[in-house]
């Protein structure tokens, strides 16, 4: 009886177990996971070609980049120096400057000597008096505190600080300057900024100075027969280097009154020097300078050796800027160049005269009747051309 009952039960248990293990009759093959689809490899990407290296700067581009670098350095140094100069102007110094402007002097030389002794002068400027002899030089040119004076390219104001206070009451000082608001990468704009900063340091001394903006690309002076004295100090070589000497001297002649004076101080080259070459080093031959200026409506009225220096050999690789105050070589042989001092300079006085009128063209002669043709002669040997 028990065996008969256990048989069906055992069969049912086996069936249930089989059903559980096979998911109730589904075949193992039907429930097996499908294999993953093959993954396509990513398409090959060709990297873009490397950019071509920038072209090598040309020699001119390198030169310009170096010039801009030097300009930035010079500007930074000038601005730093100006900050020190502004800070130097204490109330006591301003008071002394005002007193100098108000002081009365018996003559021009005494006025300049009074300005030379002032503490208002920029530090270091008085150290150059022994080389530049301003009282003797200006007296030679006929300077008086009642004149209208034009200082042509005053640089950093070495003469300006002597002229401005002594002309403020009864005279007038005009000073040329380049546009300080010109392009930042233009060195002429920088020079204009330097002089403007100089004037702005002391309204007491320089408040009455009238600046005359000039453009070397279009040389022009607005003054016409109104100036007594033009001071052209250490600037002629720059005019020559830029090919502008004749036109600027002509403009100066036009600005002067009849019999007005042009005072020239210029680094003096050796007599046999070629002007176009020596000008690159800052020097010009004296005889040539006189001839060129007289050709523009001037007459030489006198020479002075106040600024002569026989120690100047004029043969430095760095030109006249090798000497003080520039010391282009830095500390190299500095003592040697300091012992020489500033350059040997011509000091000339010219007076304005009427320009020679150009010769009128000769009236053409009445053409003669053509002569009978002559027998051609043997051609002559051509003459040897003259040297330029």
What residues fall within each predicted segment?
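Bacterial signal peptide processing site
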Residues: 25-28
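Class I SAM-dependent methyltransferase Rossmann-like catalytic core
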Residues: 110-144
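S-adenosyl-L-methionine
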Residues: 186-219
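A short acidic, Gly/Pro-enriched loop at the edge of an enzyme's catalytic core
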Residues: 209, 219-230
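A short glycine-rich, Lys/Arg-flanked "PGG" loop and its adjoining helix->strand segment in the class I
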Residues: 164-165, 245-260
């Amino acid at each position: 009886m028990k065996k008969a009952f256990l048989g069906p039960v055992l069969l049912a248990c086996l069936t249930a177990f089989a059903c559980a293990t096979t998911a109730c009759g589904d075949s193992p093959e039907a429930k097996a996971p499908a294999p993953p689809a093959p993954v396509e490899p990513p398409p090959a990407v060709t990297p873009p070609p490397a950019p071509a290296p920038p072209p090598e700067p040309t020699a001119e581009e390198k030169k310009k980049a170096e010039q801009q670098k030097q300009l930035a350095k010079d500007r930074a140094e000038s601005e730093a120096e100006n900050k020190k100069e502004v800070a130097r102007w204490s109330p006591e110094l301003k008071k002394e400057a005002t007193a100098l402007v108000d002081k009365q002097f018996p003559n021009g030389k005494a006025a300049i000597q009074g300005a030379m002794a002032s503490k208002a002068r920029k530090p270091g400027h008085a150290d150059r008096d022994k080389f530049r002899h301003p009282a003797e030089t200006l007296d030679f040119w006929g300077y008086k505190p009642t004149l209208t004076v034009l200082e042509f390219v005053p640089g950093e104001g070495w003469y300006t600080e002597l002229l401005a206070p002594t002309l403020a009451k009864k005279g007038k000082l005009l000073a040329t300057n380049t546009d300080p608001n010109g392009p930042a990468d233009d060195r002429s704009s920088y020079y204009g900024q330097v002089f403007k900063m100089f004037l702005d340091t002391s309204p007491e001394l320089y408040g009455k100075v009238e600046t005359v903006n000039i453009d070397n690309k279009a040389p022009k002076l607005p003054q016409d027969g109104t100036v007594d004295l033009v001071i052209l100090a250490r600037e002629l070589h720059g005019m020559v280097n830029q090919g502008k000497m004749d036109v600027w001297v002509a403009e100066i002649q036009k600005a002067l009154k009849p019999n007005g004076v042009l005072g020239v101080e210029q680094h003096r080259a050796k007599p046999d020097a070629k002007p176009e070459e020596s000008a690159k080093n800052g020097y010009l031959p004296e005889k040539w300078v006189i001839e060129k200026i007289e050709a523009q409506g001037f007459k030489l009225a006198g020479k002075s050796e106040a600024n002569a220096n026989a120690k100047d050999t004029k043969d430095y690789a760095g030109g006249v800027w090798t000497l003080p105050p520039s010391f282009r070589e830095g500390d190299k042989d500095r003592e040697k160049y300091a012992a020489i001092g500033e350059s040997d300079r011509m000091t000339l006085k010219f007076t304005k005269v009427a320009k020679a009128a150009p010769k009128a063209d000769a009236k053409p002669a009445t053409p003669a009747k053509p002569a009978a043709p002559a027998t051609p002669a043997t051609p002559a040997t051509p003459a040897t051309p003259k040297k330029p």
